[in-house]
Amino acid sequence: MICLLQRVTHGSVSVSNETIGQISSGLVVLCGFQPHDTTESLEKMAHKLLHYRVFSDEDDKMNLNLQQAFSGKGGDLLLVPQFTLAADTKKGLRPSFHTSASPDLAHNLFNEFVALITLKFGPPQTGKFGANMQVSLINDGPVTFWLET
């Protein structure tokens, strides 16, 4: 599994000009899936995502995770499925998607990942799997990390 994590002051996702998910300060996470992903890799990513220290403490050091930074203040999480994250870009000028999970598998994995996050953190805002989405965000920092399991 691949996650592109972005610390934001605002994030939203729309389909057909209708906002389907929106957050204030927190994380926008683009999620890509590969054929070898399993429940175990999703659990590892959920743990990593929720405990990754990307928010500043009182000394302005990135030392706080999502729950610590917003304890009781409503830190938000927006998960967006993104098929293209797992593309093979090593050869040529056109990406190949043989390294991406099939649409059916990726859809199931995304739903399972959302369920894991809901269990461990609470319900996230989400994009719509398979839809043409417009994602807007205000990156804070910018702080962006590529996470893999």
Swiss-Prot record:
Location(s), subcellular: Cytoplasm
GO molecular function: D-tyrosyl-tRNA(Tyr) deacylase activity; Gly-tRNA(Ala) deacylase activity; Ser(Gly)-tRNA(Ala) hydrolase activity; tRNA binding
InterPro entries per UniProt: Daa-tRNA_deacyls_DTD, DTD-like_sf
Main location: cytoplasm
Disulfide bonds, paired cysteine numbers: none
Pfam families hit by this protein: Tyr_Deacylase (PF02580)
Keyword terms, alphabetized: Cytoplasm, Hydrolase, RNA-binding, tRNA-binding
GO BP annotations, alphabetical order: D-amino acid catabolic process
Keyword tRNA-binding in annotation: yes
Domain free text: A Gly-cisPro motif from one monomer fits into the active site of the other monomer to allow specific chiral rejection of L-amino acids.
Sequence similarity: Belongs to the DTD family.
Assembly with partners or alone: Homodimer.
Protein name: D-aminoacyl-tRNA deacylase
Organism per entry: Hydrogenovibrio crunogenus (strain DSM 25203 / XCL-2) (Thiomicrospira crunogena)
Name of the gene this protein is made from: dtd
